[in-house]
Amino acid sequence: MADTGYYAGYQDDVDVDEQKRHQALYLIGIILLVTVCLTVLWVCIMLACYVPGFLKKTLEAWLNSSSLMKRRVASTLTRTPFEATGPERERNWEARRQSTTVNPASQPNTGSVF
């Protein structure tokens, strides 16, 4: 028998050790995967709880802000000239509404609902 460098009582269980190592690595991989999935789920839940509160605070702060800022945002969103936004816009609503019902052909049709 050739000297393998091990003591005489050692039994070479390379196949068994390799299978155990493979199972241990597989188990560690599953545990890490479950941990990552739970962490991602927790982050999604925290974001789902945080975002509505953030939006509420932001909108409340915006509603309490100056009317000048609201007019600028409204003119940007609606692509209306800044001068056409404001209290006189609401006062002129009836006149504008009647003019569009009298002559609807003058309004350009963009083909979209919104």
UniProtKB/Swiss-Prot annotation:
<comment type="similarity">
    <text>Belongs to the nanovirus movement protein family.</text>
</comment>
<keyword id="KW-0472">Membrane</keyword>
<feature type="compositionally biased region" description="Polar residues">
    <location>
        <begin position="98"/>
        <end position="114"/>
    </location>
</feature>
<keyword id="KW-1043">Host membrane</keyword>
<keyword id="KW-0813">Transport</keyword>
<dbReference type="GO" id="GO:0046740">
    <property type="term" value="P:transport of virus in host, cell to cell"/>
</dbReference>
<keyword id="KW-1032">Host cell membrane</keyword>
<comment type="function">
    <text>May transport viral genome to neighboring plant cells directly through plasmosdesmata, without any budding. The movement protein allows efficient cell to cell propagation, by bypassing the host cell wall barrier.</text>
</comment>
<feature type="compositionally biased region" description="Basic and acidic residues">
    <location>
        <begin position="86"/>
        <end position="97"/>
    </location>
</feature>
<feature type="region of interest" description="Disordered">
    <location>
        <begin position="79"/>
        <end position="114"/>
    </location>
</feature>
<keyword id="KW-0812">Transmembrane</keyword>
<dbReference type="GO" id="GO:0016020">
    <property type="term" value="C:membrane"/>
</dbReference>
<dbReference type="GO" id="GO:0020002">
    <property type="term" value="C:host cell plasma membrane"/>
</dbReference>
<protein>
    <recommendedName>
        <fullName>Putative movement protein</fullName>
    </recommendedName>
</protein>
<feature type="transmembrane region" description="Helical">
    <location>
        <begin position="27"/>
        <end position="47"/>
    </location>
</feature>
<keyword id="KW-0916">Viral movement protein</keyword>
<keyword id="KW-1133">Transmembrane helix</keyword>
